[in-house]
Amino acid sequence: VSTAPYGAWQSPID
């Protein structure tokens, strides 16, 4: 979870 706390499921970096 770099920039996306809940979007980590999609892209852990993005």
Swiss-Prot record:
In the record, biological process GO terms are: proteolysis
Tell me which EC number(s) this protein carries: 3.-.-.-
Regulation of its function: Stimulated by DTT. Strongly inhibited by zinc ion, Fe(2+) ion, Cu(2+) ion, mercury ion, N-bromosuccinimide and N-ethylmaleimide. Partially inhibited by cobalt ion.
Q: Which UniProt keywords apply?
A: Aminopeptidase, Hydrolase, Protease
pH dependence, per the record?
Optimum pH is 8.0.
Identify the domain of life: Bacteria
Recorded GO molecular functions are: aminopeptidase activity
**Temperature sensitivity?**
Optimum temperature is 45 degrees Celsius.
Function, as annotated: Inactivates puromycin by catalyzing the hydrolysis of the amide linkage between its aminonucleoside and O-methyl-L-tyrosine moieties. May have aminopeptidase activity.
Its quaternary organisation is: Monomer.
UniProt-recorded name of the protein: Puromycin-hydrolyzing enzyme
